[in-house]
């Protein structure tokens, strides 16, 4: 087992899962989409977010810390992320009250490609994801961890992110939950938009 799992694996897994419970930009993006489009219209977001997390984990493994030496590049990523969050949030805050087609099996939803790209962009343009994985893996795993052990931890964390997000959007897409949310959907979307814009504005203010 030690060949694949480092001694601090349980600590890393616990810290990672606890961090998932703390709502961030990805969480509010998922809630905003799942509340209206259900699982069919938001599953691609989960895949995109997981893919973005996977890329950052790979970068950490191969030497993400080197990028920190190029301050201008990291600042550019932060600015891009802030503007992206503001853009997503601006669309959600314009949500208007309207009834959900709860019994309509062919309710129009974003294409799978659009969902994946939106989720991928949300994950990649949030530098905190990179810093989180960098801090988590370097602090908990230590300098003696092997490449195979790092890869095992990386696969585990990506699968946990994907599973958690799918569970979240599945719950939001249940008919019983949808019926309770129907009248307040526009308010949920607007709230999610305000939160996303808040994240973007905070990053923009901190960087500038």
Spans of model-derived segments:
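Juxtamembrane transmembrane-helix termini in multi-pass membrane transport proteins
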Residues: 2-75, 135-153, 157
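Juxtamembrane cytosolic amphipathic helices that cap and anchor the N-termini
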Residues: 7-8, 110-115, 127
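Short alpha-helical transmembrane interface motifs in multi-pass membrane proteins
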Residues: 10-15, 83-86, 117-121, 152, ...
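Hydrophobic/aromatic residues within the transmembrane alpha-helices of Major Facilitator Superfamily
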Residues: 17, 21, 54, 90, ...
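Alpha-helical transmembrane segments and their lipid-water interface positions
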Residues: 26, 52-63, 85-91, 130, ...
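Selective transmembrane alpha-helices of multi-pass membrane proteins
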Residues: 70-100, 157, 161-167, 179-208
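Cytosolic-biased juxtamembrane loops and peripheral soluble domains of multi-pass membrane proteins
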Residues: 93-122, 173, 178-180
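Core segments of transmembrane alpha-helices
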Residues: 122-135, 192-196
């Amino acid at each position: 087992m030690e060949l694949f799992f480092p001694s601090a694996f349980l600590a890393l897994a616990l810290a990672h899962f606890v961090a998932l419970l703390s709502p961030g930009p990805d969480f509010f993006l998922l809630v905003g989409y799942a509340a209206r489009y259900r699982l069919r219209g938001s599953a691609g977001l989960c895949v995109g977010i997981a893919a973005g997390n996977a890329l950052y984990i790979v970068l950490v493994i191969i030497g993400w810390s080197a990028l920190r030496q190029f301050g201008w590049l990291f600042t550019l990523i932060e600015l891009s992320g802030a503007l992206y969050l503001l853009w997503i949030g601006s669309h959600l805050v314009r949500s208007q009250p309207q009834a959900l087609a709860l019994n309509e099996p062919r309710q129009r939803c974003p294409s799978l490609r659009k969902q994946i790209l939106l989720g991928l962009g949300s994950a990649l343009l949030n530098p905190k994801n990179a810093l989180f994985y960098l801090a988590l893996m370097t602090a908990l795993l230590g300098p003696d961890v092997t490449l195979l052990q790092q890869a095992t931890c990386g696969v585990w964390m990506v699968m946990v992110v994907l599973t958690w997000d799918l569970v979240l959007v599945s719950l939001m897409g249940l008919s019983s939950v949808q019926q309770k949310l129907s009248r307040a959907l526009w308010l949920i979307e607007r709230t999610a938009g305000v939160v996303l814009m808040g994240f973007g504005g905070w990053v923009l203010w901190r960087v500038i």
